[in-house]
Every structure is written in C-alpha cells, then in structure tokens.
Amino acid sequence: MFFLATADAQGRPDCSYKGGISGFVRITGASELAFPSYDGNGMFRSLGNIAVNPSVGILFIDFESPRRLRVNGEATFSDVDPLMAELPGAQLIVRVRAQQIFPNCPRYIHRSAGSEPSEYAPRAGHVPPQPKWKSMDFVVDVLPGASKKD
C-alpha cells in the first residue's frame, strides 16, 4: 500500500490511498515503477490530476518493520500497457519515472499486527464484491458505466 500525492493544473494538492495484493506495485526499470489503477470512486482525482500535471509524490509505509520510502517523479498512464495482462482488475497502468527516491524517518509509525488484503483488492481467481456505496440512489446515476450496480 502507498499514498499517492498529485496536484491539479492550478497546483491544488490531493492525496489518495492505493492498495492491492502483495506485488501490485512493480519495479519496471532502474528509476521506474508501475501500478494498476483499479475501479475507484469515479472521481478520477489521481488520474485527472496526472493528466494535467504529471508531478507525483508517493509514500510507501511498511507498518511491520517499520520503514518509509518516498518516491517523487512524473507519472503517465495507459490502457494498452503490457502490464495490464499481469495485474487482474487493472483498468489502466500508471508508470512513474522517479526523480527522487529516499528513505524517510520511521520513528512515529504505529505498529500494525499483520494485515490481509481488502476483499475488494483485485487478484487472479477472485471477483471483488460491489461496494455498498455504489448502490446508493444518490450516486448510481453519476458513476462511470463499469462502476454502476447491476
């Protein structure tokens, strides 16, 4: 899991939690990483921001060790990336060309006693359930087609 910081065209920041099963973030080159964009809340805050301002900040936190790692760089995304076939549930692949990678002081990280991936995390052989909030009357009509209830 990690936190992804983006900013819109006017520089207004946004931060999102990104999660998946172990290995959903891939190191794809000496200074490049990639991760899938899964079905979300339909607001496209991260991807919308990346489309107009590719600068991103990523904070990885290992609550068990504890350790933190920061990655700052420029992101792009594609729906025809070869990694799509390797990451079940991916709607797009986001690639980040790292400009800075550095550890961050872990002294205030609280400890977590083991964790399992969310039941909503896409993976091979598992169909995530539809989140209850996507069935609420006040959001159904504004969700993208793939996100709407059946």
Feature names for model-found ranges:
Residues 1-150:
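Binding-site signature for planar aromatic cofactors or substrates
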